[in-house]
Amino acid sequence: MKKIEAIIKPFKLDEVKEALHEIGLQGITVTEAKGFGRQKGHTELYRGAEYVVDFLPKVKIELVIEDALVERAIEAIQQAAQTGRIGDGKIFVYAIEEAIRIRTGERGGDAI
């Protein structure tokens, strides 16, 4: 099992969710996040004063899937989230030792 964590632009969430659904993946966790990478931040004018906004709004998507689906999931996320501009995000893949469904006690692939 692998955990895929993707940090994407918020307006791309629906496209990514639909792309994952099209390849048969349904269970995802979504968290609002803030961060910056190479694009750094930007400046905004508020009531005549200039402010530096270091952290930009992002969305973090997490899903745990069987190893056989990892490449398809990565491709789906990458294609749906890509704008070709700085700040499109990142995808991280982690190994998962165990998954347990709390309600039933199912383990491993049955739990996801």
UniProtKB/Swiss-Prot annotation:
Gene Ontology molecular function terms on file: ATP binding; enzyme regulator activity
Q: Identify the SMART domains for this entry.
A: P-II (SM00938)
Task: Could you list this entry's UniProt keywords, alphabetically sorted.
Answer: Nitrogen fixation, Nucleotide-binding, Phosphoprotein, Transcription, Transcription regulation
GO CC term (a single one)? cytosol
Report the superkingdom from the record: Bacteria
The record's listing under Pfam families reads: P-II
Entry annotated with the keyword Ribosomal protein: no
Function of the molecule: P-II indirectly controls the transcription of the glutamine synthetase gene (glnA). P-II prevents NR-II-catalyzed conversion of NR-I to NR-I-phosphate, the transcriptional activator of glnA. When P-II is uridylylated to P-II-UMP, these events are reversed. When the ratio of Gln to 2-ketoglutarate decreases, P-II is uridylylated to P-II-UMP, which causes the deadenylation of glutamine synthetase, so activating the enzyme.
Protein name as catalogued: Nitrogen regulatory protein P-II
Q: Which organism is it from?
A: Rhodospirillum rubrum (strain ATCC 11170 / ATH 1.1.1 / DSM 467 / LMG 4362 / NCIMB 8255 / S1)
Give the source lineage, highest ranks first.
Bacteria, Pseudomonadati, Pseudomonadota, Alphaproteobacteria, Rhodospirillales
